[in-house]
Amino acid sequence: MLRLASTLALLIVAPLASAASDPRDVVTLLYAAVQAPAPDEATIPPLLGDALRSAIDAQRVYERTCAALAAPDEKPHMLDQSPYLMAPDRPETVKVGLPATSGDGSWVPVEMAVGDYRWTDRVLLQRQGPDWKVMDIRWGQGGNLIGRLKQFSAFRCTASGG
């Protein structure tokens, strides 16, 4: 009986473990979390590469610091949207395409639309250990996630109200 339970547990866990090792599945999980009615922030960090996860964490700390320095009637320096999307509005449709993989790198196209406006973002993944991790997002409207984070942190927050 114990052997049967162990075999069943392996059959259940194995597909979950392999899901994180496919670039398309990683991107699908990322956008499912971003698009959720209440975005699931706990799901996202394990999908990110070490450098990107550190940059996102630093951006959040920086936002909190800016908020603490701002006057009560002043809006602090912050991103008013998901950092993973270029536009502040969430897309109405998201379709994850097939990855173009070469060695330890993979680009996955993500087609999105709001009304009649359509664009394709490209997600860069890199193998880290056994898993594929998101390293950057290049937005179809121009720019990329790493660039936005660098630009955001270049602004110097100062105490207001003298």
Describe the role of every protein-language-model region.
Residues 1-6:
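Bacterial N-terminal signal peptides that target proteins for export
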Residues 13-18:
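N-terminal signal peptide c-region/cleavage motif recognized by signal peptidases
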Residues 21-39:
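Short, aromatic-enriched amphipathic alpha-helices that serve as compact interaction elements
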Residues 35-67:
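Short, solvent-exposed secondary-structure junction/capping segments
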Residues 56-117:
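Surface-exposed, charged secondary-structure patches
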Residues 101-105, 109, 115-120, 136-162:
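Low-complexity, intrinsically disordered terminal/linker segments enriched in charged
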Residues 121-127:
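Hydrophobic/aromatic beta-strand elements that line small-molecule binding cavities or substrate pockets
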